[in-house]
Regions:
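Catalytic histidine-centered segment of alpha/beta-hydrolase-like enzymes
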Residues: 98-113, 117
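C-terminal alpha-helix
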Residues: 119-130
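Acidic/histidine metal-binding catalytic segments
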Residues: 6-20
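Conserved serine/cysteine hydrolase catalytic core
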Residues: 21-92, 97-100
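Hydrophobic, aliphatic-enriched repeat segments that assemble into extended interaction scaffolds
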Residues: 64-66, 117, 121
Length: 130
């Protein structure tokens, strides 16, 4: 597989191909099931929502941030190999923690799905026991 797709766990890549792509209505090939402008709007709206910081600080529930490697200073804007997450985000939550994966990319759940699943399951169990 090309580019970042070569980092995906093989089973995750198959799931992505089965469920993340649709036949191209304009002819041969496939297109993303989530239109690129919709996906981009998720990231762009977070940058323009100035009230988000107050909302984050008001939360008292436990929050765990799973963050991939930081972007290189000279990276291309279309390079998705690093995390778009602010490195100090976890500290903005009153009960925030972070697990940092310095050698993983923005596609963290697709790279190490079993490890991510285990972390999520542990968090759910901890919340239920609290």
């Amino acid at each position: 597989p090309k580019g970042s797709f070569g980092l995906f766990d093989p089973e995750m890549l198959m799931d992505y191909c089965r469920h993340g792509l649709l036949p191209n209505e304009k002819g041969k090939g496939y297109v993303l099931a989530c239109p690129p402008h919709i996906e981009a709007s998720v990231y762009m709206s977070s940058r323009s929502n100035h009230d988000i910081y107050d909302a984050v600080r008001s939360l008292s529930l436990p929050v765990l941030i799973l963050r991939a490697k930081e972007p290189a200073k000279d990276r291309n804007a279309m390079d998705f190999s690093s995390s778009p997450t602010w490195p100090k985000l976890a500290s903005e939550f009153s009960n925030g923690r972070e697990i940092y994966f310095a050698d993983k990319t923005h596609f963290l759940p697709m790279e190490i799905p079993e490890e991510i699943t285990k972390i999520i399951a542990q968090e759910i169990t901890s919340a239920q026991e609290a």
